[in-house]
Amino acid sequence: MQFSENALLSIIVVIASDTTEPQANVSLLTGCLDALSRQVNPPPMEVIVPYHQRVVGIDSLRGRFPQVDFVLVNDLKAWSRAGGSREHHDELKSVALKKARGQIIGFLEDNEVPDLNWCAATVDAHKKEYAGIGGAIENKVDRLLNWAVYFCDFGRYQNPVIDGESAFASDANVSYKRSALEAVRPSWEEGLNEVTVNAALTSRGEKLALSAEMVVYQQRHGLRLGPALRERYVWGRSFGAVRCQVMSFPARLALAAVSPLLPGLVALKLGMTAWRKRRNFSKFVQAFPLVLLLLMGWGFGELLGYLTRRPA
């Protein structure tokens, strides 16, 4: 890992696996940091891991990865301390971004293991004029529940991903030019959510893109159905609440009205995407009952997000 005070690339890794748990650990984070430490032809870079006080195991990682900047954040406003929320992830990203020194800012989650060429591919992708560039996401745990969660979250980011301009990019594997983020600083000053930030960027005429070379592998070992369902609800409600900030009242009511239809419609869209990519379609078919169940959890959360304008 080529760490430098004059970093070209700053990578912010958020511990997102604590959405439904009051206490997080670093079991997934270790794999992510290990991959970052073994990058091929890396640019001058830094890695920042913001965390709250209930993350267990940080001290052991400090010894293993001494060049990583582990940042304790004590004053989180949105953290429930009891599990069942994700808004504190946005706060953690905002705090880390204010510390970052790179010209390019990358965001990863602890359960994503980056390809060993990820850093080089990210810097290369930013030679183009896009403000934000997302990458491909693959599943590496061959269990039906993992496939179901993967297809619900990241099916459209499965390679082959078409390089070039895109209307979306996942916050689990994305990078931005620092200059573009600074231009929309009010949108992430208190918390960085990709829906709000991307809307702010595109409203300025900036463009987003996808790169098939920026690959990460989702490795969520130990997934259980109950927590996975609760996670869908929490994230769906957060998504609905955040979208309320960038849409009109009539649009909000219209989305709330059609929310009960979303699980079926989204399941159909996910199936079409899996078929079109010609990869892992049989896994989608096998996992379909779980996919539909998880989408129902998300849809209920999204509906409440639209109605209450509040996350879980």
Label for each model-derived stretch:
Residues 190-199:
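Acidic donor-binding loop at a coil-to-helix junction in glycosyltransferase catalytic cores
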Residues 136, 149-167:
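Short, flexible, basic/aromatic active-site loop/helix in glycosyltransferases
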Residues 101-102, 170-183:
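Conserved nucleotide-sugar donor-binding
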